[in-house]
Amino acid sequence: MSAPVITKELIAKHGLTDEEYARIQGILGRDPNITELGVFSVMWSEHCSYKNTKRELRKFPTTGPLVLVKAGEENAGVIDIGDGWAVAFKMESHNHPSAIEPFQGAATGVGGIIRDIFTMGARPVFSLDSLRFGPIHGDTEQHKWNRSRFAGVVSGIAHYGNCIGVPTIGGEVFFDESYNGNPLVNVFCLGILKHEQIARGAAKGVGNPVFYVGAETGRDGLAGAAFASRDLTEESKQDRPAVQVGDPFREKLLLEACLELLATDAVAGIQDMGAAGLTCSTCETASRGGTGVEIDLAKVPQRETGMTPYETLLSESQERMLIIVKKGHEQTVVDIFEKWDLPYAEVGVVKDDGMMRVLDHGKLAVEIPAAKLADDAPLYSREWKARPEPAPLDLSALAAVDEKAALLKLLAHPTIASKQWVWRQFDHMVRLGCAVLPGSDAAVFIVREADKILAATSDCNSLYVLQDPREGARIAIAEAARNLTCSGARLLAVTDNLNFANPHNPELFWQLRESVEGLAEGCREFGTPVTGGNVSLYNQSPAGPIDPTPTVGMVGIIDDAKHITTQAFKSAGDVIILAGPVLDPAAGDLSLGASHYVKVVHGRKAGRTPRLSFDLEKRVQAAVLGLIRDGLVKSAHDCSEGGLAVALAESCIGGKLGATVELPSGPALDKYPAHAARAALLFGESQSRIILGIAPENADRVLAALAAAKIPHSRLGTVGGDKLSITAHGATLAAPLAEVSDPFEHSIERAMEG
């Protein structure tokens, strides 16, 4: 068969511009063949090269005394946790595949991030998920589509994680109309390793053999990286072949075989085959090693016949690795992979010429300078245009509503409601390390082999980011830190997943720029370096762009098991104390702007994002963590979506205890309509607030400590009884605990199961 002629149409179909094609011609000194065009297409896609965002990502702080492997150096960052132990962790997205094939898209997202972790030499110990979908309550075709995506994604995550034995122990699920045509599936994984076990993905040692190990290559996932670098359209369902198919049982074998091999002295370098498959693993290892790699596709294990070099190189079949083996240790690889009944083949050799050279049955198919391919994609500074600041809320125009009905409606909203329908599908007790059941402020996991207790969370309120990208991103960092603090952890580091729409739209690219600035500022304030992450662009469908969603994954460490703290109230008679302001007096919208109350109860995305003071936030968190370490705190809960009323309800529901609370008011609220003042006290989303449950004998000591730290604080009430009663601005909201619990615990289940 004759080779295709490279035309302008073919170049455009591969997602390359005329200027990029001219750059390729300059690198090669000739026209590329069709296989080389495909190779450049995937490696220079946004998914692999970050060509639209790399200049922005350089704003992140990436260094610190605990950083052992920095962002961008390897497949995942690595952080020192003491006593010779370290953690490798990262967050990745599988958004586009999950929109087309939710089960396989989500499942292979889990498999991919797990491979990133064990490629570093770490044993994966747990994962988290940050998921976004359109509304699921309703009978329209869109609601049905959203439910099918939600069900498929959760089932795919559960299938892969449960089968491979890596527990999913937490995360977040957010529902909003902006995700109607484009759900988001962000997956976080963390692994544990000793310092000396850190593995590198570099092709070192000229003459060292290159081994392919793992599943055979097929045509699934063909050019998946390029698929993930364009908008979803009505025709995207035709891209179903670009969605990979995963086998968690095969990956479990691959994990164990690779860790066993890494424990020997046989490995010079190791790289998983994720996005761009064999292409990416070959050129990246060569580029990192400052060497060349030559492989012959005739030696690559294949499960389909008649595959072309183009298909073999661009396939994203799962559960595959590339290993650079120290010469003379080939038999070690053979013995281990035969033991684990996994395919393997010696497919090439490390060269000294800096080239990625691919043969097909001895015939030259690809010859490209590896560093140019892996590291020299064009970088763009996209045009941006700031959006005008949103108008403040007209509080006098907010209709008066029944506050009890509003609370029940908020508790029933799937973003706020219990995610037990999701959690019960996950075997979160695999490895017996899950110390806090899913649903509290952060996941807590005991790593017994290292005698360490880790905490992790994922956070982002996209309503905040939509209204003010920089402030919303600052709050995402602060809330992640607050969730870890409420669990008794000190902060370590951050990974992120930047989910945005089309970067060629100036207003949408401005959202990304501002969000990066906010994340970077937050990380500097909390001393949490960014260890790596993912950028996912082109998240928009015919329904429109998603709301900007810079998801934060943050990791902390709990120094003593006695410090593990949860959000549930513990005992009748305990005193409820608020660390932080009841209401931010400087908030022009009374902290109702961009709130879930305004969205869910009044049906609007409106107003200004709450303001965040890093100074106050850090003082509140430091004081609360100190109180936890002093043994004075029985429960701690971050106050976020839905405000104080929702946070109090969650602590009551978790502890199966009622509460009687009075929220302090003041003359500053008298200038507002009474119903607006009550709404602000109950449902406003002022920042830097933590609800504490304190034994009565310790209440005065806690209040004195907060006063000494010059932190706004209030004694709100007591735990006990069988109802939740909250008095605010002269009126009382009261409901039996059973009535409060029902919508919270069963809303998602009713939507999904009828």
Where are these regions (language model features)?
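Glycine/proline-enriched, intrinsically flexible loops and inter-domain linkers
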Residues: M1-G754
